[in-house]
């Protein structure tokens, strides 16, 4: 899409003016976790995690497998690598999605309702995993959620958006003491 007004900037560069090569390089720096796990049913857990490497890296097959296994191990799913998405729970599918999102060592991670459809205990596991991974790998993370427990558990800088407009922004203490 071509913007009708304004600009889309990525690290200070105008997205619309970027070359295809620059956009591919930019894509390598971004991880995405969707509301549903968005896994390929016909691919194993390992193959799902390897998918971004297949698309955006020049690594050998052996190195791609090794990197994907490292990410699966990080989300405690190394034993599920040969299973298919339909054979694992929703919480496990979310962890596969997290492994896939971090496999390229992104600078930025975008999460759309990462706890959607999960029970409270599994939601807490996902929150703790996202929090520890983003700190461990120094990933700037943007999470879109309606779950205020999740927001207060893992949010550092919180923005409240209503009908497409930022109503307010602050840290956890400012959110807790907000009177509006």
Segments the model singles out, each with a brief description of its role:
Residues 13-14, 61-79:
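Conserved ABC ATPase "signature" region
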Residues 84-88, 92:
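Conserved ABC ATPase signature
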Residues 103-107:
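A short, proline-enriched helix->beta-strand linker immediately N-terminal to the Walker B motif
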Residues 6-14:
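Conserved ABC transporter NBD signature motif
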Residues 109-112:
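Catalytic Walker B motif of ABC-type/P-loop ATPase nucleotide-binding domains
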């Amino acid at each position: 899409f071509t913007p009708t007004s304004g600009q889309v900037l990525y690290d200070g560069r105008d997205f619309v003016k970027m070359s295809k090569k620059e956009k591919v390089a930019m894509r390598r720096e971004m991880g995405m976790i969707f509301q549903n796990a968005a896994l390929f049913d016909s691919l194993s857990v390992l193959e799902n995690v390897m998918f971004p490497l297949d698309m955006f890296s020049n690594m050998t097959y052996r190195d791609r497998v090794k990197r994907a296994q490292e990410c699966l191990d990080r989300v405690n799913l190394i034993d599920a690598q040969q299973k298919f998405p339909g054979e694992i729970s929703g919480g496990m599918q979310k962890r596969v999605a997290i492994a896939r999102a971090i496999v390229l060592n992104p600078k930025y991670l975008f999460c759309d309702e990462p706890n959607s459809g999960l029970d409270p205990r599994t939601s807490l596991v996902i929150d703790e995993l996202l929090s520890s991974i983003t700190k461990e790998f120094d990933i700037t993370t943007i999470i879109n959620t309606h779950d205020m427990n999740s927001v207060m558990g893992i949010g550092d800088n919180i923005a409240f958006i209503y009908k497409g407009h930022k109503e307010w922004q602050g840290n956890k203490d400012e959110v807790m003491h907000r009177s509006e």
